[in-house]
Amino acid sequence: DFEELHRFSNNPRLHDGHERWNVGELLDGLTTGLAKISNGGRDVISIGVDTWGVDYGLLDGRKRLIEDPICYRDNRTDGIVEHVQQLISRDELFRITGLQTLPLNTIYQLVAQREAREWPPSAAHLLMMPDIVHHYLCGELVGEHTMASTTQLASATTREWAPEVFECLGLPFEVM
Protein backbone atom coordinates (compact mmCIF):
# COMPACT_ATOMS: atom_id res chain seq x y z
CA ASP A 1 0.00 0.00 0.00
CA PHE A 2 1.07 3.54 -0.71
CA GLU A 3 0.14 6.57 1.30
CA GLU A 4 0.75 10.12 0.13
CA LEU A 5 2.36 12.04 2.98
CA HIS A 6 3.28 15.26 1.26
CA ARG A 7 2.71 17.07 -2.02
CA PHE A 8 4.09 20.37 -3.23
CA SER A 9 3.81 22.46 -6.37
CA ASN A 10 6.50 22.83 -8.98
CA ASN A 11 5.93 25.89 -11.09
CA PRO A 12 8.51 27.72 -13.17
CA ARG A 13 8.82 31.45 -12.59
CA LEU A 14 10.03 34.28 -14.79
CA HIS A 15 13.46 35.51 -13.63
CA ASP A 16 16.21 37.28 -15.59
CA GLY A 17 14.15 37.00 -18.77
CA HIS A 18 13.73 33.21 -18.62
CA GLU A 19 11.29 30.71 -17.18
CA ARG A 20 13.22 29.00 -14.38
CA TRP A 21 12.68 26.18 -11.94
CA ASN A 22 12.83 27.31 -8.31
CA VAL A 23 15.28 24.68 -7.05
CA GLY A 24 15.28 26.05 -3.50
CA GLU A 25 11.51 25.66 -3.32
CA LEU A 26 11.70 22.13 -4.77
CA LEU A 27 14.36 21.06 -2.28
CA ASP A 28 12.38 22.63 0.59
CA GLY A 29 9.36 20.56 -0.48
CA LEU A 30 11.51 17.46 -0.60
CA THR A 31 12.98 18.20 2.84
CA THR A 32 9.51 18.70 4.30
CA GLY A 33 8.38 15.37 2.84
CA LEU A 34 11.41 13.55 4.22
CA ALA A 35 10.80 15.12 7.65
CA LYS A 36 7.19 13.86 7.59
CA ILE A 37 8.46 10.36 6.85
CA SER A 38 10.99 10.56 9.66
CA ASN A 39 8.52 12.05 12.15
CA GLY A 40 6.02 9.34 11.28
CA GLY A 41 8.35 6.65 12.61
CA ARG A 42 8.75 4.97 9.25
CA ASP A 43 11.92 3.16 8.28
CA VAL A 44 13.46 4.51 5.09
CA ILE A 45 15.46 1.89 3.24
CA SER A 46 16.21 3.94 0.14
CA ILE A 47 15.13 7.01 -1.75
CA GLY A 48 14.53 7.14 -5.48
CA VAL A 49 14.59 10.33 -7.49
CA ASP A 50 12.41 10.65 -10.58
CA THR A 51 12.09 13.89 -12.52
CA TRP A 52 11.63 15.04 -16.08
CA GLY A 53 14.53 14.99 -18.49
CA VAL A 54 16.29 17.66 -20.57
CA ASP A 55 16.70 20.45 -17.96
CA TYR A 56 20.00 20.99 -16.19
CA GLY A 57 21.77 23.21 -13.69
CA LEU A 58 25.31 24.54 -13.68
CA LEU A 59 27.42 24.35 -10.54
CA ASP A 60 30.58 26.24 -9.69
CA GLY A 61 33.89 24.76 -8.55
CA ARG A 62 32.60 24.61 -4.98
CA LYS A 63 29.69 22.44 -6.20
CA ARG A 64 27.06 25.15 -5.65
CA LEU A 65 24.22 25.80 -8.07
CA ILE A 66 25.04 29.05 -9.88
CA GLU A 67 21.47 29.94 -10.83
CA ASP A 68 18.09 28.27 -11.04
CA PRO A 69 17.84 26.05 -14.14
CA ILE A 70 15.97 27.37 -17.14
CA CYS A 71 12.79 25.45 -17.92
CA TYR A 72 12.42 23.47 -21.15
CA ARG A 73 9.26 25.54 -21.77
CA ASP A 74 11.33 28.72 -22.13
CA ASN A 75 11.49 30.13 -25.67
CA ARG A 76 15.30 30.42 -25.79
CA THR A 77 15.57 27.44 -28.15
CA ASP A 78 13.41 29.03 -30.86
CA GLY A 79 15.36 28.63 -34.12
CA ILE A 80 18.25 26.72 -32.50
CA VAL A 81 17.47 23.36 -34.15
CA GLU A 82 18.08 24.86 -37.58
CA HIS A 83 21.32 26.46 -36.37
CA VAL A 84 22.58 23.14 -34.96
CA GLN A 85 21.70 21.34 -38.20
CA GLN A 86 24.12 23.64 -40.02
CA LEU A 87 26.87 22.20 -37.79
CA ILE A 88 25.76 18.55 -37.64
CA SER A 89 23.00 16.92 -39.67
CA ARG A 90 19.89 15.53 -38.06
CA ASP A 91 20.77 12.08 -39.46
CA GLU A 92 24.31 12.15 -38.05
CA LEU A 93 23.06 13.31 -34.66
CA PHE A 94 20.48 10.52 -34.63
CA ARG A 95 23.11 7.96 -35.69
CA ILE A 96 25.28 8.94 -32.71
CA THR A 97 22.64 9.53 -30.03
CA GLY A 98 19.59 7.56 -31.16
CA LEU A 99 17.38 10.39 -29.97
CA GLN A 100 14.77 12.26 -31.94
CA THR A 101 15.24 15.97 -32.50
CA LEU A 102 13.07 18.08 -30.22
CA PRO A 103 13.78 21.78 -29.58
CA LEU A 104 13.54 21.20 -25.82
CA ASN A 105 16.38 18.63 -25.74
CA THR A 106 19.36 19.61 -23.60
CA ILE A 107 21.64 19.89 -26.64
CA TYR A 108 19.58 22.80 -27.99
CA GLN A 109 19.28 24.44 -24.58
CA LEU A 110 23.08 24.37 -24.20
CA VAL A 111 23.67 25.78 -27.68
CA ALA A 112 21.07 28.50 -27.00
CA GLN A 113 22.79 29.39 -23.72
CA ARG A 114 26.18 29.55 -25.43
CA GLU A 115 24.87 31.56 -28.39
CA ALA A 116 23.21 34.08 -26.05
CA ARG A 117 26.54 34.43 -24.22
CA GLU A 118 24.82 33.41 -20.99
CA TRP A 119 27.33 30.72 -20.05
CA PRO A 120 28.55 31.54 -16.52
CA PRO A 121 32.37 31.70 -16.44
CA SER A 122 32.31 29.96 -13.05
CA ALA A 123 30.50 26.88 -14.44
CA ALA A 124 32.49 23.77 -13.52
CA HIS A 125 29.82 21.05 -13.47
CA LEU A 126 26.55 20.32 -15.24
CA LEU A 127 23.90 18.22 -13.50
CA MET A 128 20.56 17.13 -14.86
CA MET A 129 17.54 17.91 -12.65
CA PRO A 130 17.40 14.57 -10.79
CA ASP A 131 21.16 14.69 -10.31
CA ILE A 132 20.77 18.10 -8.64
CA VAL A 133 18.47 16.35 -6.16
CA HIS A 134 20.96 13.48 -5.77
CA HIS A 135 23.69 16.03 -5.06
CA TYR A 136 21.48 17.74 -2.46
CA LEU A 137 20.74 14.43 -0.73
CA CYS A 138 24.21 12.89 -0.72
CA GLY A 139 26.74 15.50 -1.86
CA GLU A 140 27.94 13.50 -4.87
CA LEU A 141 28.22 14.76 -8.44
CA VAL A 142 26.78 11.95 -10.53
CA GLY A 143 25.35 11.89 -14.04
CA GLU A 144 22.80 9.09 -14.16
CA HIS A 145 22.75 7.32 -17.55
CA THR A 146 19.03 7.22 -18.30
CA MET A 147 18.78 10.95 -17.67
CA ALA A 148 21.91 11.60 -19.76
CA SER A 149 20.20 9.79 -22.61
CA THR A 150 17.56 12.58 -22.76
CA THR A 151 20.20 15.20 -23.60
CA GLN A 152 20.93 14.17 -27.21
CA LEU A 153 24.59 14.40 -26.14
CA ALA A 154 25.17 10.76 -25.17
CA SER A 155 26.17 7.91 -27.46
CA ALA A 156 23.46 5.30 -27.92
CA THR A 157 26.10 2.59 -28.45
CA THR A 158 28.69 3.36 -25.75
CA ARG A 159 26.28 4.82 -23.14
CA GLU A 160 28.89 7.54 -22.54
CA TRP A 161 28.95 11.20 -23.48
CA ALA A 162 29.60 11.71 -27.20
CA PRO A 163 32.65 14.01 -27.32
CA GLU A 164 32.36 14.40 -31.09
CA VAL A 165 28.97 16.10 -30.65
CA PHE A 166 30.35 18.49 -28.03
CA GLU A 167 33.32 19.32 -30.27
CA CYS A 168 31.18 19.85 -33.36
CA LEU A 169 28.92 22.29 -31.49
CA GLY A 170 31.63 24.01 -29.44
CA LEU A 171 30.09 22.90 -26.14
CA PRO A 172 32.25 22.52 -23.01
CA PHE A 173 32.81 18.79 -22.52
CA GLU A 174 34.75 19.32 -19.30
CA VAL A 175 31.63 20.23 -17.27
CA MET A 176 30.00 16.84 -17.83
Task: Give the positions of each predicted feature.
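Short beta-strand-loop/turn "lid" adjacent to the catalytic site in phosphate-handling enzymes
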Residues: 15, 39-73, 97-104, 130, ...
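Short alpha-helix plus adjacent loop in nuclease-associated cores
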Residues: 70, 74-89
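Gly/Ser/Thr-rich active-site cleft segment
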Residues: 93-176
